[in-house]
């Protein structure tokens, strides 16, 4: 698959070079991919211990993360304790959410977040019923979570977060416009 992308990117770069004196070309990803080697069947275990989804709590089961909402703080504590006993993942603590950029002022993203370890999936989940060979969306500290930035030039900015890609594109485009004016 990489050869297919390389061929098309080189073709695109060639088209740009046909119409411009200077082309600064870069490609970026927003995350890496991890090989999947196992799955956990989390939904029936949570429902066995805490009742059906939608009664005392609301849960959304993504392939790598489970999010929980409840107005019952003691239930959230019980969920956190139960999930904290699992070796296949961990709960994201409140103080860590700011570092990850997920400390939202509202509850739209959940009250409690459980993320599975790299290489595992929650199967079934609301994202699918079967295990896949690769996945993203693990904790940013995961070995294969890093994104990449490839280009034919040295960037003026060193992006360390996906939010910085826009700043890099804006600075590069602005500099090229100024140089050509």
Regions picked out by a protein language model, each given a short descriptive name:
Residues 1-4, 38, 60, 75:
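Short acidic-hydrophobic sequence patches enriched in Asp/Glu that either
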